[in-house]
């Protein structure tokens, strides 16, 4: 097993209190496993995202609330657990860890129970993702693969629907699917090029 590489990570935990724990367990019972009783996951894949905005602080504040806002109807109808991710990468490449890596975050339909989520601050038009974020994501993927050798896949959020049919994908609600475009094929290609030696798989359609 390779040594876990040193990586500068800033711990900035969001609220993961009894309210979030209860909502996380309820979400798992509804969507993944009726017998679920905890928030722990066994990481088997990494999902990269972008936030859709330009501020790490704004994203952190949004994720910090345990309960989803009712106006996000499609998501809220599928459970009141707020969205979040284990990591948030700022535009300068600073890596923020928002919760323990093996606690479940709600970031990707069907895969939350096996996936570590990495949100990148930005969006395609106003705040295009940066070279520093490419480097940071690649370093973080390398760190996570060394720490959790069972990780086999690296995908972009826009690729997650192609995982349906794979054993990792579990979603008990056949109608709960969301279309995503983040972070996009160009960003994924850049990150994948930097970690190609790890041999991580993509979603079936992205190989």
PLM region spans:
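Solvent-exposed, acidic/flexible segments
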Residues: 41, 80, 111, 126-134
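Substrate-binding clefts and substrate-entry loops adjacent to catalytic sites
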Residues: 104, 117-129
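N-terminal catalytic cores of peptidoglycan-degrading enzymes
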Residues: 1-108
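Short coil-to-beta-strand
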Residues: 109-117
